């Protein structure tokens, strides 16, 4: 039988006629392929001593499990048996009943399709054989046998966007892909530059969408809030018309569900992956001031949508649908094109594919750090003779966070930043920190010999040879270095996120491997390393003014040229790395992977005080680096770097620091900005933009300004018969007026300029002016008298 290659798009398991069926949809060089695997039995693990009780309880439920004693043990050391059932339903019912009877059941939450792939080390890429039936549009493989593969797919992608009325009636659906680009529009045919497929009504619109998917058959669907908005509404309208949305492969219907607590939507479409632009960018650690399509496309591409305000947009869409459908089609398709351009510019599809190849998580998985770790770790753990523990819901001890040193405030010349390269991953590798290593290490005495354990913190100790995590990180580290050399940005970013998430997973009570001894052995070792490194630097005559997690800020004590600073930086890291290598070898008989790097030389650097005190602040600083065309002003944690400060404060801070860092007098600039603010010349810079982190009705006692503005906006929306915007979180833009906060789109009262002087300009100025002997209030006193 010929062995073929493919890439897993979707996975699903269900019960059919008394046995299970796993359905995997793949992208292959020969087109879409459906693998059918029958008869895989769901399994969970029980203590061998409970076998008879399990059989008794199963009999009461008319379930006949198969129990197999194993050589595997729990982390507590108890011998285990595997409990197999014929169907997923039987397995779930039995596991639930045993849990109610307070019996230990392990790994009952691992889904059948996930376990099937995981235990075969299948991570995205797959090799398969079986009986192939060709259905033209796709192939089906019966009695499929699978193993790990190494195949990089070329997936075809469509960008989808809908336009609708404020009541949620569909007007049109835009689809943009290399295969076909069109808008399906309700209405009578009329000439248009945009390719339009005209349909009679909403029902025919949905039928045309189903036919489009059947004809052009994309692997991936992308969009902006495409799950929570577009697909939610498409399903709602299909339900209204009693129509199954059969947009899956093999004419299978898509399935939409809403999480009960968060109201977040989830969609599954057999054979097709749905990637939401916002969620995928967040998973790939992108940050934007606003997540609107307009804002992100302006920032990334320098182009955006034609209509900005949400209500203007709604009114204009309604107008276009009634009187100018060709313009609506152009607008609809433009959104699809923008999303395609954003995905191309950020390599998001490549990122999702590489993440799946590295960890085995689904292409459309949001976040997924715990799932990634479980996928990689569980099969190795089984082969080492253990079954994974369950989540520990209570009684867990929080581990200390990263090291943050008290800063020494001041305005400095020549500050170096020295960074430990991937500090937490390198601690895991150097000190052999690992869940299995902890269980095995606790059986040994602590010491330097080969048969002794490596000491950790809070009672943790680690086996010198029985571990997986250090090797997992070593492989990822090497892959990332290669990706960097090959300039594969998406691959490098995917590896970095996964590697850094491993500490977060071990330190999260949402992970089955969470143990305070693991997390603390990483963070507390980090504290120790940072404190010792500070002492080593200060012993060489330099002043450490701040330290944060893995970065150390070193004041050289005067003005140094770039070359002089570089020489000092390189010498320092070389000496300190050598010290750590010798220290780990002598104290622990370990090989150090710790690597301090010389990161940056700031020609001028400000470490501010905490507002209203003389104490140095944390995670807040600014610096000037480079010169000429390469000069850069960097802000961390200050107003310029925070999205909840107004553009006025951000621009003021940027220019003020620019002047002071270059030794220029800022007095005239400060007075001018205050004058312009009071004269109403900078009103467009006074808009606050803040996220509502809860539902509007949940704000009871403390009602911040953004909530007051949001409530006012939705009260007005209700009176005007417009949809409410802010009930379920969201982002609000508002201004402070003499009558308090008002939403930007409905603001009527005069602006409270004094508020902006006191709350936006003054805090920015007060952070830096005292270091050059000036006071904001004294500088602006004459201006205030004029107004």
PLM region descriptions:
Residues 479-485:
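Catalytic P-loop NTP-binding/switch module of NTPases
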Residues 15-28, 32-34, 343, 349, ...:
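DNA-dependent DNA polymerase catalytic subunits
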Residues 195-202, 519, 523, 562-566:
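Flexible, glycine- and charge-enriched loops at secondary-structure boundaries
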Residues 307-312, 504-508, 543-553:
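Core alpha/beta catalytic barrel or barrel-like domain that forms the active/cofactor pocket
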Residues 46-47, 522-526:
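Short, surface-exposed ligand-recognition loops at beta-strand->loop->(often short) alpha-helix junctions
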Residues 81-83, 276, 509, 513, ...:
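Short, hydrophobic beta-strand segments
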Residues 1-278, 283-389, 397-416, 420-476, ...:
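The two-metal-ion catalytic cores of nucleic-acid processing enzymes
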Residues 181-194, 505-520, 524:
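Gly-rich Lys/Arg/Thr-decorated short loops/hinges at beta-loop-alpha junctions or inter-strand turns
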């Amino acid at each position: 039988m010929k062995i073929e290659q493919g890439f897993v798009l979707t996975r699903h398991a269900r019960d059919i006629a008394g046995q299970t069926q796993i359905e995997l949809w793949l992208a292959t060089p020969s087109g879409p392929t459906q693998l059918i695997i029958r008869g895989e039995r769901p399994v969970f693990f029980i203590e061998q001593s409970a076998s008879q009780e399990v059989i008794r309880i199963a009999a009461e439920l008319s379930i006949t499990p198969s129990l197999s004693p194993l050589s595997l043990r729990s982390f507590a050391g108890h011998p285990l048996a595997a409990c197999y059932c014929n169907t997923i339903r039987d397995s779930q019912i039995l596991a639930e009943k045993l849990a109610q009877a307070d019996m230990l059941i392990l790994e009952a939450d691992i889904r059948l399709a996930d376990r099937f792939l995981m235990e075969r080390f299948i991570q995205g890429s797959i090799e398969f054989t079986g009986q192939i039936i060709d259905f033209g549009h796709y192939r089906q493989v019966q009695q499929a046998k699978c193993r790990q593969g190494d195949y990089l797919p070329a997936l075809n992608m469509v960008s989808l966007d809908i336009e609708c009325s404020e009541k949620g009636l569909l007007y049109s659906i835009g689809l943009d892909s290399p295969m076909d680009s069109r808008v399906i529009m309700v209405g009578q045919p009329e000439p248009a530059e945009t390719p339009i497929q005209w349909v009679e009504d909403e029902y025919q619109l949905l039928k045309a969408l189903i036919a489009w998917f059947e004809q052009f058959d994309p692997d991936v669907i992308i969009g902006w809030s495409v799950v929570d908005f577009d697909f939610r509404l498409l399903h709602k309208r299909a339900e209204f018309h009693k129509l199954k949305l059969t947009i899956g492969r093999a004419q299978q219907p898509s399935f939409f569900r809403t999480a009960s607590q968060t109201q977040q939507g989830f969609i599954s479409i057999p054979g097709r992956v749905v990637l939401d632009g916002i969620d995928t960018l967040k998973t790939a650690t992108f940050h934007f001031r606003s997540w609107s399509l307009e804002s992100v496309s302006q920032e990334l591409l320098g182009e955006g949508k034609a209509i900005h305000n949400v209500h203007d947009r709604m009114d204009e869409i309604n107008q276009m649908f009634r009187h100018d459908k060709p313009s609506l089609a152009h607008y609809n398709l433009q959104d699809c094109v923008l999303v395609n351009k954003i995905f191309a510019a950020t390599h998001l599809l490549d990122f999702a594919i590489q993440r799946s190849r590295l960890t085995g998580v689904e292409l459309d998985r949001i976040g997924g750090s715990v799932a990634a770790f479980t996928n990689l770790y569980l099969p190795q753990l089984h082969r080492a003779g253990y079954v994974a523990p369950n989540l520990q819901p209570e009684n867990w001890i929080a581990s200390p966070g990263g090291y943050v040193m008290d800063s020494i405030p001041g305005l400095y010349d020549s500050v170096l930043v020295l960074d430990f390269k991937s500090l937490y991953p390198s601690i895991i590798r150097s000190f052999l920190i690992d869940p299995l290593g902890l269980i095995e290490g606790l059986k040994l005495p602590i010491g330097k010999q080969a048969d002794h354990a490596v000491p950790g913190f809070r009672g943790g100790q680690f086996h010198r040879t029985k571990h997986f995590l250090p090797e997992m990180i070593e492989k990822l580290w090497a892959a990332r270095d290669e990706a960097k050399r090959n300039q594969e940005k998406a691959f490098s970013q995917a590896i970095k996120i996964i590697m850094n998430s491993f500490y977060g997973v071990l330190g999260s009570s949402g992970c089955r491997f969470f143990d305070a001894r693991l997390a603390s052995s990483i963070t507390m070792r980090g504290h120790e390393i940072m404190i010792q490194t500070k002492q080593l630097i200060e012993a060489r005559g330099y002043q450490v003014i701040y330290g944060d997690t893995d970065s150390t800020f070193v004041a050289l004590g005067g003005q140094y040229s770039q070359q002089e600073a570089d020489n000092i930086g390189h010498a320092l890291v070389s000496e300190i790395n050598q010290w750590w290598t010798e220290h780990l070898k002598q104290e622990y008989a370990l090989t150090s992977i710790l690597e301090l790097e010389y990161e940056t030389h700031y020609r001028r650097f400000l470490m501010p005080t905490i507002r209203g005190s003389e104490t140095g602040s944390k995670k807040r600083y600014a610096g000037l680096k480079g010169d000429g065309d390469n000069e850069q002003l960097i802000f961390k944690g200050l107003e310029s770097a925070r999205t909840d400060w107004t553009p006025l404060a951000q621009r003021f801070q940027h220019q003020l620091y620019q002047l002071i860092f270059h030794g220029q007098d800022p007095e005239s600039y400060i007075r001018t900005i205050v004058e312009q603010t009071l004269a109403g010349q900078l009103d467009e810079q006074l808009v606050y933009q803040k996220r509502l982190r809860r539902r509007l009705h949940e704000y009871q006692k403390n009602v911040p300004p953004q909530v007051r503005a949001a409530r006012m906006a939705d009260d007005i929306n209700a009176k005007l018969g417009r949809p409410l915007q802010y009930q379920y979180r969201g982002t609000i833009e508002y201004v402070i007026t003499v009558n308090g906060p008002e939403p930007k789109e409905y603001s009527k009262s005069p602006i409270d300029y004094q508020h902006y002087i006191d709350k936006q300009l003054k805090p920015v100025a007060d952070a830096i002016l005292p270091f050059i002997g000036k006071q904001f209030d004294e500088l602006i006193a004459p201006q205030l008298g004029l107004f």
